[in-house]
């Protein structure tokens, strides 16, 4: 858990620093002031939104490529064998029922039962399953998992969470810069440029706000997970989806799913304390099963 938070903060700080330098070198802030937009907070908010959304959309645009590289996923271009043929045809069948373009289909080598979907557009997505899923699940259970991933694509969850991340990034950047400027000018009486007080306060505020932002993003991720379960129940059948989740309860906890894909997988890291649950991308499996049991067949 601490590693995930540290990676989030490090990435957020790196994006802010790099994009801030680039935009300042391009003279964007000076241009805005010359156009009469000299209200400091307005300029700062524009910068925050640009930086906040840029990082999210760059990650989204690269998501398929990065997912394939990080997971070592091998795309199925020409199915080899009955199992790969079944996998491709199952994805195609669900995609057609949802009215979306055929996603790329891939398999990655991992012992745990898991799968993920990613991609910038509904009609150009990627659905990947682990070798452990194909080896340890029945066809009915695997079908439900595939339906879950196709539902993520059909619901546009990748773009939705990217927009949410962009919004929270904007406020993290904006509020941390406001705090830094306040301390720099009011406490250290520095009216020219950004002194040490600004940088120390800004980075500290960004770390604190980044943790809160992660909690917000994970809250929405958990909500989208319930919706994907419901979509899978519609596509594959409620009982199949419940059976798949029951199988996941008895499976090995996923360890090597990168955070970028975990939110769109079928199985996330198990929670412990109430605090840890706030950072979970997936609801507890028991809650997901109970939600499906309350859904009409």
UniProtKB/Swiss-Prot annotation:
UniProt keyword Transmembrane present: yes
Cofactor: Zn(2+)
UniProt xrefs under InterPro entries: HtpX_protease (IPR050083), Pept_M48_protease_HtpX (IPR022919), Peptidase_M48 (IPR001915)
Cofactor binding notes: Binds 1 zinc ion per subunit.
Cell compartment(s), UniProt: Cell inner membrane
Chain residues that bind Zn(2+): 148, 152, 225
PROSITE patterns per record: ZINC_PROTEASE (PS00142)
GO cellular component terms, semicolon-separated: plasma membrane
GO biological process: proteolysis
Similarity annotation: Belongs to the peptidase M48B family.
Protein name as annotated: Protease HtpX
């Amino acid at each position: 858990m601490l590693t995930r938070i540290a990676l989030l903060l490090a990435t957020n700080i790196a994006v802010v620093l790099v994009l801030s330098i680039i935009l300042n070198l391009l003279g964007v802030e000076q241009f805005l002031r010359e156009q009469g937009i000299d209200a400091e907070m307005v300029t700062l908010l524009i910068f925050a939104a640009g930086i906040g959304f840029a990082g999210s959309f760059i990650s989204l645009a690269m998501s398929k490529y990065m997912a394939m590289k990080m997971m070592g996923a091998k795309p199925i271009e020409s199915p080899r064998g009955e199992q790969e043929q079944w996998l491709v045809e199952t994805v195609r069948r669900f995609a057609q029922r949802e009215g979306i373009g055929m996603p790329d289909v891939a398999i990655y080598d991992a012992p745990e039962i898991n799968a993920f979907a990613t991609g910038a557009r509904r009609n150009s997505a990627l659905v990947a399953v682990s070798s452990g899923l194909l080896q340890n699940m029945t066809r009915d259970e695997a079908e439900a998992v595939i339906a879950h991933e196709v539902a993520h694509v059909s619901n546009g969850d990748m773009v939705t969470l990217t927009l949410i991340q962009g919004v929270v990034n904007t406020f993290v950047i904006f509020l941390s810069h406001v705090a830094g400027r306040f301390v720099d000018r009011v406490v250290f009486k520095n009216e020219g440029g950004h002194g040490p007080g600004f940088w120390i306060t800004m980075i500290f505020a960004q770390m604190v706000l980044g943790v809160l932002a992660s909690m917000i993003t994970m809250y929405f991720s958990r909500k989208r997970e319930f919706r994907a379960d419901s979509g899978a129940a519609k596509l594959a059948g409620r009982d199949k989806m419940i059976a798949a989740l029951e199988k996941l309860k008895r499976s090995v906890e996923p360890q090597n799913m990168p955070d970028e894909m975990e939110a769109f997988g079928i199985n996330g890291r198990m929670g412990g304390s109430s605090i840890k649950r706030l950072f979970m991308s997936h609801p507890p499996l028991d809650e997901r099963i109970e939600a499906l049991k309350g859904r009409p067949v």
